[in-house]
Amino acid sequence: MAEYPLKQRFVLDTSLFLSEEIRDDDETFEEGIERLLDTIAAARLDLNISCYMPPSIAAELEHILRERGVSEDVLGKLDTWVIKKHPDRYEVYIPAEVVYRFIDEMSDRVNRGLRVSEKAVRKAEESKQLSNGGSKLSDVDKVISDLREDYRGALRQGVLDSREDFDLLILARELNAGVVTEDTGIISWAADFGLRNLRGRAFPTLLEEYLVALDSPRPWTRGDDGVDPDRL
């Protein structure tokens, strides 16, 4: 254990592990995940840095990793070094202003979703008018596909759209922990919750820099005369 443990805590999102940015060019998906978990383990043992996940997010991540063929050994490391903890939903308080903003944003997004739907209806009607009496199923399918994509963008991107996202923020607030994610919606709301946040792509480098600094000479170990006491 480090002589001066940092005692930092981080709550990790699924997007951290799925980001291509955490992997080296010559690494496979599994190798990148394993290297990240080994770094998390070293930070836990040497720096007392703890990483957490709500069980809901952990289950989601494990399912994705299994689908991508990640070995049980690597999944075992995930279970060992990332602590699963349920957020205390009854004791963690959220400022009323945050709730008001969420309501306003959802109301705005519903209106945007309606506009997207209206646009799709008009587009479908135009396709019908252009029809020469033949089958226009492919045109309708295209309209529906575009509608789904646009509707998802209007309502879901940049917003908390699942219980898992909310669990992550509540747990981070409870633990006074930093949030590690690539999800822009979570990043935005982490700021409103008064939480530290870090892009997932930067997290491995952060831990590695901490570990390197642990073995480097420390200015605060020198005596009043500027001489390193270990060299006397």
UniProtKB/Swiss-Prot annotation:
Disruption phenotype: Deletion mutant shows no growth phenotype under standard conditions, temperature stress or salt stress.
Keywords tagged on the record: Endonuclease, Hydrolase, Nuclease, tRNA processing
Enzyme Commission number(s) of this protein: 3.1.26.5
Single GO MF descriptor: ribonuclease P activity
GO terms, biological process: tRNA 5'-leader removal
Listed InterPro entries: RNA_free_RNase_P (IPR014856)
Similarity annotation: Belongs to the HARP family.
PANTHER family: RNA-FREE RIBONUCLEASE P, UPF0278 PROTEIN TK1425
NCBIfam families cross-referenced by the UniProt entry: PRK04358.1-2, RNA_lig_partner
Function, in words: RNA-free RNase P that catalyzes the removal of the 5'-leader sequence from pre-tRNA to produce the mature 5'-terminus.
Note: The ease to obtain knockout of this gene and the lack of growth phenotypes upon gene deletion suggests that archaeal HARPs do not make a major contribution to global tRNA 5'-end maturation in archaea, but may well exert a specialised, yet unknown function in (t)RNA metabolism.
Protein name: RNA-free ribonuclease P
Lineage: Archaea, Methanobacteriati, Methanobacteriota, Stenosarchaea group, Halobacteria
